[in-house]
């Protein structure tokens, strides 16, 4: 692979958190996928449940308790040996095999939320990304307004599991590329 192609690679990330506020809530799962510029998956990173003390889990609202207990994530978090620092370091170690720091925008759905949590709880991982974002939810919002048929023709499963959510974000961007952008 040429250096130019390597510089076109994209890092996709998704987090699961105990809530929506980075100052009050915590990361409980992180996953990444690296794709080429054409959205072909090159590698799936480690899916890491991030240990959090029980006091943080006890502060989750009903939606988070139901969702993350139902998926088995709460149990994985309790059993995990990864704190936020170790999870960030392991993720960066994986990413360095495929792309240099500062090259890829942060890619995903509603990615600003993930970036907020990374900046607060995993600043080393947040700093690995370029400052730009590739946010699939921007295209979704535009499609809703400019071509609702395209927006409505992609259905998400809503698994709220980090790796599954990334795969779905990539598929959604492929959908918009095929149906929303004219060639």
Curated annotation (Swiss-Prot):
Subcellular location: Cytoplasm
Record's function text: 3'-to-5' exoribonuclease specific for small oligoribonucleotides.
Domain Exonuclease: 10-173
Family the UniProt entry places it in: Belongs to the oligoribonuclease family.
GO biological process, one term: DNA metabolic process
Name of this chain's protein: Oligoribonuclease
Record-level GO cellular component terms: cytoplasm
Originating organism: Idiomarina loihiensis (strain ATCC BAA-735 / DSM 15497 / L2-TR)
Main location: cytoplasm
EC number of this enzyme: 3.1.15.-
Database matches in SMART domains: EXOIII
Matching SUPFAM superfamilies: Ribonuclease H-like
GO molecular function: 3'-5'-RNA exonuclease activity; nucleic acid binding
Catalytic residues as annotated in Swiss-Prot or TrEMBL: 131
PANTHER family for the chain: OLIGORIBONUCLEASE, MITOCHONDRIAL (PTHR11046:SF0)
